[in-house]
UniProtKB/Swiss-Prot annotation:
A Pfam family the protein falls into: Protocadherin
Keyword line: Calcium, Cell adhesion, Cell membrane, Glycoprotein, Membrane, Repeat, Signal, Transmembrane, Transmembrane helix
Record gene name: PCDH11X
Residue ranges of every copy of the Cadherin domain listed in the record: 26-139, 140-249, 250-355, 362-466, 467-570, 571-673, 677-795
Record's signal peptide: 1-23
Any one Gene Ontology cellular component term annotated for this protein: plasma membrane
Record: glycosylation sites: 27, 48, 54, 344, 553, 773
Name assigned to this protein: Protocadherin-11 X-linked
């Protein structure tokens, strides 16, 4: 398939290339003597013309044989198919190629033109004529005589004349044979260098002239063709006397050149031969061999005696350029000498070029006829120029003598195509006589000329042209038929029938006109009426007689001139106008419309009123009628007059019309009541009147007419009980119901009478007083009631005037007074109840006001906080409060050594220990609502208070306190975290409920500036009264670590617990030790903290249990002997990487700040178990430092929120494994937020709240849970806890003996699943006899040993 496709593409490309070149050659092979109508080839297939893309051809493809006029071609070609056939002419190779050497091929050439011009190509076809054996070889003579000396040696050879065969190749002479030689002679054949075969006679026996002097035999020559042809000749051998020597040529081969114009007698060459004999035997005779052609014998002369060769006739190189002359030199013997003379005739420019015209377009009487509309490049003839001369003498060019719309385009050597170079135009040039010139390149050049005649045939390519492009004619109307209007004319540039023009009316021409077909005269055949048609616009056509005919048109405009032949015409014969009677004077009554079909002045109409009527005027131009009077319908209802209309024609025409003006009534009168005559009249209605009885009739009249006078009645007021009804047309008032006692009295009925006028109806009203009673006993009272009713406004709810119930007003007043009294009493009662309920709150507010000097909230939040306090219901705690006080010192940041200003805050305290004992530590949590945005919640731990009993005998010097650094812009209230004032409210300033005495403690505290970031833990020293732990935190957390910035002040808060307090602050759990103990460490710490510094932090924010926002994880345990003062400086990154917006505003707390992890060697089960009991944030943090299996197990047991957080920070393998056990919501959320390499920097931190109660079931701890560490006293035993020894973490069930330093860890427990608060139980050092016992679940309760 690929091969076929490639072949097809190659053929297409070849066809395109060939056709683009414009000329092509094709070779065929034919044999001579072929019969007629033998198929030679198919040009359509052989030239791949069927592969040419299908083009839109003007005519079908045509093949035309181009040959010279008078020639008889040997072949013919089918014009439609391109098939080539032989003709009846004989194909004779020997005749066609007589002058060429025998060793050259014989060709016959013709040209074929492929039409039409869109695909024109000229193809030269060369036919190679193959020789057939149609000629027999012949000897020069039928009898060959030869003489042989009798002393010829045996095997001597004597050359015989050669036979000649016109055929070539195998069909030529191939063999000779000697017949009847009597064994005396034999025959041998030799081949000359030119390829000729020469017979030689061989002497086979000794000759004896005396015995026999003559031998006669036959010699036969044969060719090699099929069938084989041969001929014979008689060979007569004469035996002569002995001849000892033979002639010898001095030169056996001679080649000479002689110009073809050499004159006759010119010596060609001189031959020299010698013979050693003497006498007669020495005489040499020169002669041409019988192999020399007849042409050579005719052109050259050989002197038999001297051997001189001369020109006998003029030479012609173009006829025979080379001649071979075989010369024999004989001394009379039988062995002549041979010499070959080769004569080359050189060319001279003796031949003029010849011009051969072969027509592609068949001529008529030697003239080519071309249509003027033939396309460009139309091929006309093939011009072949030849020159018989050689080289540059035969190089010919051809051209025309002057500028003509034709050109010669070369296609083959010395062949040119004559084609059109421009469009022909019969109208400009009708005939062309083209002179063709041909010149060779010889010196001097020779030229030749020929004439070619072309006649242009006219085509109908020109349409008639009118002399006018637009014809305008005017004619008056009312004309006589047959009037000639105008004559139109047109010309045509064509000739003959193409120029004959006929005139026709266009299809849009009206029937009123006619046109002469030959002359173009336009005539009106009907009477024209301008009022029907004022103009005519139509076309006239001019059509020639060509094929196809061509037409053109001209527009004719006929304008009709008007005549005053029409009178003005009113739109109506009679006009009736209706005007209201209130039409003002000179108002518009109406419009008279008049038309006149004429034009111009003939249609200018003027209007006027006849009979000199002065009551009305009419505008003469517009026809508007206006009154000069005021109308009164009652005086005159209509007016009549005539209007005249007259045109402005030369002979004017007029007409008139009747006008009637009718005055129309206007609704300008209201109905007037006749009955009742006034509003003061009344009608008596007896209570016994039956329903449906007409009790009264109102009558109203209207002075208008028609609908304006039609009156309708209706009740529009009074009649509140619907006791009466009125007929809208008659005005009869009918009683609708039976009257009872309540209906007695004067009824005031408002009756409306309105007309039906349009567009606005007019109306009047009247009061109809109907007195329902048995009789009129007191006319004065009735008249008074009527008078009062007239003075009172009338509404649809007008009540009746009851003469029998004068006390009704007093009853209404009494009812209103009672209702008002009851309302006042209810309002007073409600007010008292409300104030009673608000009394406790008012007292609490008063106390808050009294304590405002030491508890002042942030100014921006004061108003909002106070509003919250009023709205929330406070929960009251037991009446006990620890003794606390806070001292806040502020200094300028730029003066480090300044003493600063001391500010003392007074806090309420209660020193009674019995009160403390009443507080329920277990049931009263110190948690806050998670969404509370206040400072107290921010700095307060979210865990409930631990349940333990504080011993009152704890000495003051054993109490621990911690300094907490707070943001400068926050006011921290030092109210007890487990007190009533803050345990149940999110308001951090709700201290007014702490209704206890106030004791003031004042402790001086030095102002600290922020130490450098690389400062390590201070040395810890024992304190007698109190121990201070100071932690500095920059007020504004930043993302980048930086040192102390000058100009920013710091603040610290010191919390103290006095002697005898029931609550103490917690420290880091340090016992008695020296400063050197701080340097010991067991493993690396995160964030660059020193080991001791990290573990000595009481809370992430260094807050104490003794303030109002204490951290439960730092709960004090009785028995601690000493505390330490440390300063921890977390970097800015430590305090801000996991900060929330609340932390950035209020400062850092355990809600947002998380210390780094401690250990990386945790048990998988312990990690998973711890995560299952940790809050979401801790679980997510743990995920970051746990091995994959632990992460997956932990995630499967975590609540959805924890799973989502952890998944978002876990690597992809963990996410995939955990998601298999996660709910759909967690899967979708985690996958959406988890990056490919999920890591979170926040996982490096974990607050103390994240410790899990499940830690009791495994020895190792999760590596990311932040654990507190404390130093153990000697001889300490614990029921439950863990210690870090040499072998790692282990349970302290066995107890820790001796003075070895041990590290203990806290535990935490979630109260319930929905609560974010974590109860943290710190395990710290114990004095002897102290132990930890289990409490709720796994949370131990620390208590003093019984001893």
């Amino acid at each position: 398939m690929d091969l076929l496709s490639g072949t097809y593409i190659f053929a297409v490309l070849l066809a395109c290339v060939v056709f683009h070149s414009g000329a092509q050659e094709k070779n065929y092979t034919i044999r001579e003597e072929m019969p007629e109508n033998v198929l030679i080839g198919d040009l359509l297939k052989d030239l791949n013309l069927s592969l040419i893309p299908n083009k839109s051809l003007t005519t079908a493809m045509q093949f035309k044989l181009v040959y010279k006029t008078g020639d008889v071609p040997l072949i013919r070609i089918e014009e439609d198919t391109g098939e080539i056939f032989t003709t009846g002419a004989r194909i004779d190779r020997e005749k066609l190629c007589a002058g060429i050497p025998r060793d050259e091929h014989c060709f016959y050439e013709v040209e074929v033109a492929i039409l039409p011009d869109e695909i024109f190509r000229l193809v030269k076809i060369r036919f190679l004529i193959e020789d057939i054996n149609d000629n027999a070889p012949l000897f020069p003579a039928t009898v060959i005589n030869i003489s042989i000396p009798e002393n010829s040696a045996i095997n001597s050879k004597y050359t015989l004349p050669a036979a000649v065969d016109p055929d070539v190749g195998i069909n030529g002479v191939q063999n000779y044979e000697l017949i009847k030689s009597q064994n005396m002679f034999g025959l041998d054949v030799i081949e000359t260098p030119e390829g000729d075969k020469m017979p030689q006679l061989i002497v086979q026996k000794e000759l004896d002239r005396e015995k026999k002097d003559t031998y006669v035999m036959k010699v036969k020559v044969e060719d090699g063709g099929f069938p084989q042809r041969s001929s014979t000749a008689i060979l007569q051998v004469s035996v002569t006397d002995t001849n000892d020597n033979h002639p010898v040529f001095k030169e056996t081969e001679i080649e000479v050149s002689i110009p073809e114009n050499a004159p006759v007698g010119t010596s060609v060459t001189q031959l020299h031969a010698t013979d050693a004999d003497i006498g007669e035997n020495a005489k040499i005779h020169f002669s041409f061999s019988n192999l020399v052609s007849n042409i050579a014998r005719r052109l050259f002369h050989l002197n038999a005696t001297t051997g001189l060769i001369t020109i006998k006739e003029p030479l012609d190189r173009e006829e025979t350029p080379n001649h071979k002359l075989l010369v024999l030199a004989s001394d009379g013997g039988l062995m002549p000498a041979r010499a070959m003379v080769l004569v080359n005739v050189t060319d001279v420019n003796d031949n003029v070029p010849s011009i051969d015209i072969r027509y592609i377009v068949n001529p008529v009487n030697d003239t080519v006829v071309l249509s003027e509309n033939i396309p460009l490049n139309t091929k006309i003839a093939l011009i072949t120029v030849t020159d018989k001369d050689a080289d540059h003498n035969g190089r010919v060019t051809c051209f025309t003598d002057h500028e003509i719309p034709f050109r010669l385009r070369p296609v083959f050597s010395n062949q040119f195509l004559l084609e059109t170079a421009a469009y022909l135009d019969y109208e400009s040039t009708k005939e062309y006589a083209i002179k063709l010139l041909a010149a060779d390149a010889g010196k001097p050049p020779l030229n030749q000329s020929a004439m070619l005649f072309i006649k242009v045939k006219d085509e109908n390519d020109n349409a008639p042209v009118f002399t006018q492009s637009f014809v305008t004619v005017s004619i008056p109307e009312n004309n006589s038929p047959g009037i000639q209007l105008t004559k139109v004319s047109a010309t045509d540039a064509d000739s003959g029938p193409n120029a004959e023009i006929n005139y026709l009316l266009g299809p849009d021409a009206p029937p009123e006109f006619s046109l002469d077909r030959r002359t173009g005269m336009l005539t009106v055949v009907k009477k024209l009426d301008r009022e029907k048609e004022d103009k005519y616009l139509f076309t006239i056509l001019a059509k020639d007689n060509g094929v196809p005919p061509l037409t053109s048109n001209v527009t004719v405009f006929v304008s009709i001139i008007d005549q005053n032949d029409n009178s003005p015409v009113f739109t109506h014969n009679e006009y009736n106008f209706y005007v209201p009677e209130n039409l003002p004077r000179h108002g518009t009554v109406g419009l008279i419309t008049v038309t006149d079909p004429d034009y111009g002045d003939n249609s200018a109409v003027t209007l006027s009123i006849l009979d000199e009527n002065d009551d009305f005027t009419i505008d003469s131009q517009t026809g508007v009628i206006r009154p000069n009077i005021s109308f009164d319908r009652e005086k005159q209802e209509s007016y009549t007059f005539y209007v005249k209309a007259e045109d402005g024609g030369r002979v004017s025409r007029s007409s008139s019309a009747k006008v009637t003006i009718n005055v129309v009534d206007v609704n300008d009168n209201k109905p007037v009541f006749i009955v009742p005559p006034s509003n003061y009249s009344y009608e008596l209605v007896l209570p016994s009147t039956n329903p449906g009885t007409v009790v009264f009739q109102v009558i109203a009249v209207d002075n208008d007419t028609g609908m304006n006078a039609e009156v309708r009645y209706s009740i529009v007021g009074g009649n509140t009980r619907d006791l009466f009804a009125i007929d809208q047309e008659t005005g009869n008032i009918t009683l609708m119901e039976k009257c009872d006692v309540t209906d007695l009295g004067l009824h005031r009925v408002l009756v409306k009478a309105n007309d039906l006028g349009q567009p606005d109806s007019l109306f009047s009203v009247v009061i109809v007083n109907l007195f329902v009673n048995e009789s009129v006993t007191n006319a004065t009272l009735i008249n008074e009631l009527v008078r009062k009713s007239i003075e009172a406004p009338v509404t649809p709810n007008t009540e009746i005037a009851d003469v029998s119930s004068p006390t009704n007003d007093y009853v209404k007043i009494l009812v209103a007074a009672v209702a008002g009294t009851i309302t006042v009493v209810v309002v007073i009662f409600i007010t008292a109840v409300v104030r009673c309920r608000q009394a406790p709150h008012l007292k609490a507010a008063q106390k808050n006001k009294q304590n405002s000097e030491w508890a002042t909230p942030n100014p921006e939040n004061r108003q909002m906080i106070m509003m919250k306090k009023r709205k929330k219901k406070k929960k009251h705690s037991p009446k006990n409060l620890l003794l606390n006080f806070v001292t806040i010192e502020e200094t300028k940041a730029d003066d480090v050594d300044s003493d600063g200003n001391r500010v003392t805050l007074d806090l309420p305290i209660d020193l009674e220990e019995q009160t403390m004992g009443k507080y329920d530590w277990v049931t009263t949590p110190t948690t806050f609502k998670p969404d509370s945005p206040d400072l107290a919640r921010h700095y307060k731990s979210a865990s409930p208070q631990p349940a333990f009993q504080i011993q009152p005998e704890t000495p003051l010097n054993s109490k621990h306190h911690i300094i907490q650094e707070l943001p400068l812009d926050n006011t921290f209230v030092a109210c007890d975290s487990i007190s009533k004032c803050s345990s149940s409210s999110s308001d951090p300033y709700s201290v007014s409920d702490c209704g206890y005495p106030v004791t003031t403690f004042e402790v001086p505290v030095s102002v600290h500036t922020r130490p450098p970031m690389k400062e390590v833990v201070r040395s810890c020293t024992p304190m007698k009264e109190s121990t201070t732990m100071e932690i500095w935190i920059h007020p504004q957390p930043q993302r980048k670590s930086e040192g102390k910035v000058a100009g920013k002040s710091q603040r610290r808060v010191t919390f103290h617990l006095p002697e005898g307090s029931q609550e103490s602050s917690s420290d880091g759990g340090l016992g008695d030790h020296d400063a050197g103990s701080l340097t010991s460490t067991s493993h690396g710490l995160p964030l660059g903290y020193p080991q001791e510094e990290y573990f000595d932090r009481a809370t992430p924010s260094n807050r104490t249990e003794g303030d109002g926002n204490s951290d439960p994880e730092s709960t004090f345990i009785p028995g601690l002997k000493k505390a330490a003062e440390i300063t921890v400086q977390p970097t800015v990154e430590e305090a801000s990487d996991n900060c929330t917006q609340e932390c950035l505003i209020y400062g850092h707390s355990d809600a947002c700040w998380m210390p780094a992890s401690l250990d990386h060697s945790s048990s998988l089960q312990a990690q998973a178990s711890a995560l299952c009991h940790s809050p979401p944030l801790s679980q997510a943090s743990t995920q970051h430092h746990s091995p994959p299996v632990t992460q997956t197990i932990a995630l499967c047991h975590s609540p959805p929120v924890t799973q989502t957080i952890a998944l978002c920070h876990s690597p992809p393998p963990i996410q995939v494994s955990a998601l298999r056990h996660s709910p759909p919501l967690v899967q979708a959320t985690a996958l959406h937020h988890s990056p490919p390499s999920a890591q979170a920097s926040a996982l490096c931190y974990s607050p103390p709240l994240a410790q899990a109660a499940a830690i009791s079931h495994s020895s190792p701890l999760p590596q990311v849970i932040a654990l507190h560490r404390s130093q153990a006293q000697s001889s300490v035993s614990l029921q439950q806890g863990w210690v870090q020894g040499a072998d790692g973490l282990c349970s302290v069930d066995q107890g820790v003996q001796g003075s070895a330093t041990s590290q203990f860890y806290t535990m935490s427990e979630r109260l319930h699943a929905s609560d974010d608060s974590i109860k943290v139980i710190p395990l710290t050092t114990f004095t002897p006899r102290q132990q930890a016992r289990p409490s709720r679940g796994d949370s131990p309760i620390m208590e003093e040993h019984p001893l």
